[in-house]
């Protein structure tokens, strides 16, 4: 942590095709080994597949899917007097987006379709319908927070 001043968060440039900052961030999350053009083709391919399959607006489907994956609360470990408690805490908006994108990509990578674009499209469509592994992950995190609600007074 800097001693002098708090460093502001960098603004990310919107993606060239749709002009969405959220989509640009997602492209960066999908990216592996700095190959941005590959990740762009994967994400744009997935959005194309969504447009063909569902017939709905692909950008709206993407944002709806992210809304269904974003966690509201999570648990953090807190050590109190020799024992560790899982303390439920609210998730900040930036982290909420980051977790949703990370879980979405992880869930897509575990799927069985042929190409990554197809896996991503499938997971996005499932998430838009409140199904799929990424939504299940969010439900598990919420369930964990609910189970540990008794330790909420240990919040810092």
Curated annotation (Swiss-Prot):
Family as reported in the entry's similarity comment: Belongs to the universal ribosomal protein uS7 family.
Protein name: Small ribosomal subunit protein uS7
A single BP term in Gene Ontology: translation
Keyword Transmembrane helix: no
Pfam family, one: Ribosomal_S7
InterPro entries, alphabetized: Ribosomal_uS7, Ribosomal_uS7_bac/org-type, Ribosomal_uS7_CS, Ribosomal_uS7_dom, Ribosomal_uS7_dom_sf
Transmembrane intervals: none
Source organism: Tolumonas auensis (strain DSM 9187 / NBRC 110442 / TA 4)
Entries under NCBIfam families matching the protein: rpsG_bact
This protein's record includes keyword tRNA-binding: yes
Subunit structure: Part of the 30S ribosomal subunit. Contacts proteins S9 and S11.
Any GO CC annotation of this UniProt entry: small ribosomal subunit
Keywords: Ribonucleoprotein, Ribosomal protein, RNA-binding, rRNA-binding, tRNA-binding
MF-aspect GO terms: rRNA binding; structural constituent of ribosome; tRNA binding
Coiled coil: none
Function: One of the primary rRNA binding proteins, it binds directly to 16S rRNA where it nucleates assembly of the head domain of the 30S subunit. Is located at the subunit interface close to the decoding center, probably blocks exit of the E-site tRNA.
């Amino acid at each position: 942590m800097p001693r002098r001043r708090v460093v502001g968060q960098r603004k990310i440039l919107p993606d060239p095709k749709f002009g969405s900052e959220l989509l640009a961030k997602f492209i960066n999350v999908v990216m592996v080994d700095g190959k941005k053009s590959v990740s762009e083709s994967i994400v744009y391919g997935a959005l194309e597949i969504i447009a063909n399959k569902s017939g709905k607006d692909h950008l709206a489907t993407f944002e709806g899917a992210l809304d269904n994956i974003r966690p509201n609360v999570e648990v953090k470990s807190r050590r109190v007097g020799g024992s560790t408690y899982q303390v439920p805490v609210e998730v900040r908006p930036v982290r909420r987006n980051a977790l949703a994108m990370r879980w979405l990509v992880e869930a897509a990578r575990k799927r069985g379709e042929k190409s990554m674009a197809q896996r991503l499209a499938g997971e996005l469509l499932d998430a838009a319908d409140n199904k799929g592994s990424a939504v299940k992950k969010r439900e598990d995190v919420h369930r964990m927070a609910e189970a540990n609600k008794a330790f909420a007074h240990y919040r810092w």
